[in-house]
Amino acid sequence: MELTPREKDKLLIFTAGLLAERRQAKGLKLNYPEAVALITCAIMEGAREGKTVAELMHAGTQILTRADVMDGIAELIPEIQVEATFPDGTKLVTVHNPIV
């Protein structure tokens, strides 16, 4: 199977997001890469499902709370930018203050 660099990046994000999801389900607090991966993965999946950029910008702030992440992690992530593939093309989704 031949994958482009972009496809490899998407698979890596999905894998990291899945790991973060499993750790969160176990009750573990997420670290920086896990938190970013979980939010990024959710945005990418939402885009694939046909949600709008505005819907995803809002949804990105509802995924994690400060209680879900290790101390200080929320302050390390002032925004997350995701280049996601929508049914009508690729768009940049920016989520400001994703962890509330």
Curated annotation (Swiss-Prot):
Compartment annotation: Cytoplasm
One GO process term, biological-process aspect: urea catabolic process
Keyword Glycosyltransferase (UniProt): no
Keyword entries, A-Z: Cytoplasm, Hydrolase
A Gene Ontology molecular function term of the record: nickel cation binding
CDD domains found in the cross-reference section: Urease_gamma
Catalyzed reactions: urea + 2 H2O + H(+) = hydrogencarbonate + 2 NH4(+)
Highest taxon, organism lineage: Bacteria
Pathway assigned to this chain's UniProt record: Nitrogen metabolism; urea degradation; CO(2) and NH(3) from urea (urease route): step 1/1
Listed EC numbers: 3.5.1.5
GO cellular component: cytoplasm
Classification via SUPFAM superfamilies: Urease, gamma-subunit
Subunit structure: Heterotrimer of UreA (gamma), UreB (beta) and UreC (alpha) subunits. Three heterotrimers associate to form the active enzyme.
Protein family according to the UniProt entry: Belongs to the urease gamma subunit family.
Protein name (record): Urease subunit gamma
Upper taxonomic lineage: Bacteria, Pseudomonadati, Pseudomonadota, Betaproteobacteria, Rhodocyclales
Gene: ureA
